[in-house]
A protein has these predicted regions:
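Short hydrophobic alpha-helices and adjacent helix-cap/hinge residues
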Residues: 2-328
Length: 328
């Protein structure tokens, strides 16, 4: 595998014999341990869950701390830092990189075109410029998408509060993943008779002010899987509760934190699925360029009864009965 750490043995013949037997397996990393770099754009529970799922699934297949050295880094929301992290991974000759969320995936792909990159929590890898197509990436990048059912999330809002007409969408226009979801929301809104009020957010420190600007202009709030907004979700929740605005979100953990509801995927399961793709590379020398991007098939209805009450909403009993998870 290219860009692996160089190592030496007592004789050149032994080196040649081992290469002949083991090919380019990453298990040949120094000290007999695999080096995996993990980078994520910001710390929030959904991304943390994806990371933990990846680590746990590899451990379940024998790649535990006795065989793997992880270098785990967080860019704290800064793209330049994400790129510096990727450069550190390359100079440190990691064998494989897990890039969590679109900005870190883009930064990492900018730095290396040879080290295998597994992505997860990336909404649209094609739109992000990471792969040539979903079916055949054509690059050193493959992995899993966290594209959530945006239309179903807005349908859920209408099912909970049919009189809703105007929905405020909080998103960072600098995140390609959020732009894709906004386009999907626009398409769905027209069919549902909803008008979207688009509220751009530049950074996490401006989330509260942006959410507050929606009060009096919208009937509900919607937060897609936007890393900037989700990292400061509590600010949106405060506004939603004070203004009695239903808050629909793009993923499960945001409901646990205090949003009202979602129909979404489970990020821990997404991380585990990504790890199984990594195993194909580690054990079978699979080429990321020919490994299709994968999606989680199952979605779940998640409700927060306490949040709904604080936002002045009475959830329909039939929805409560159908929920896969309920928080209070």
């Amino acid at each position: 595998m290219s860009e692996m750490r160089r190592w030496t043995m007592s004789t050149g013949l032994a080196v040649l014999l081992l290469i002949g037997l083991l090919g380019s397996s990453p298990i040949l990393a120094a000290e007999g341990k695999l080096k995996i770099g993990i980078t994520q754009i910001v710390e929030h529970p959904a991304l943390d869950a994806a990371k933990q799922g990846f680590i746990d699934e590899l451990a379940a297949f024998g790649y535990d701390e006795s065989k793997v050295v992880y270098d785990m880094q967080n860019a704290q929301g800064d793209f330049a830092t994400a790129q510096a992290i990727a450069e550190k991974f390359v100079s440190g000759s990691v064998d494989l990189i897990l890039a969590i969320a679109t900005p870190t995936a883009q930064a990492t792909a900018n730095v290396t075109q040879t080290i295998p990159i597994l992505i997860t929590a990336v909404t649209d890898p094609v739109a992000a410029g990471l792969v040539e197509s979903i079916e055949r990436p054509g690059t050193n990048v493959t992995g899993t998408s966290d594209l959530t059912p945006v239309a179903k999330q807005l349908e859920l809002l209408k099912a909970i509060r049919p009189e809703t007409k105007r929905v405020g969408v909080l998103y960072n226009p600098g995140e390609a993943n959020s732009v894709v979801q906004l386009e999907l929301a626009r398409d769905a809104a027209g069919e549902l008779g909803l008008a979207l009020v688009e509220i751009p957010v530049d950074n996490s420190s401006s989330v509260y002010q942006s959410a507050q600007s929606a009060v009096g202009r919208v009937d509900a709030l919607y937060v897609p899987t936007d890393n900037t907004v989700v990292s400061a979700l509590e600010s949106v929740i405060i506004v939603a509760e004070n203004a009695k605005l239903p808050l629909i979100v793009g993923e499960t953990d945001s409901v646990r934190r205090g949003a009202m509801a979602t129909i979404s995927i489970d990020y821990y399961s997404l991380g585990r699925q990504t790890a199984r793709m990594a195993l194909q590379i580690l054990e079978k020398n699979a080429d990321p360029a020919s490994m299709p991007i994968e999606y989680l098939e199952n979605v779940e209805l998640v409700l927060n009864l306490g949040a709904a009450k604080r936002m002045g909403v009475e959830l329909p009993t039939e929805l409560v009965a159908e929920a896969s998870q309920i928080f209070d």
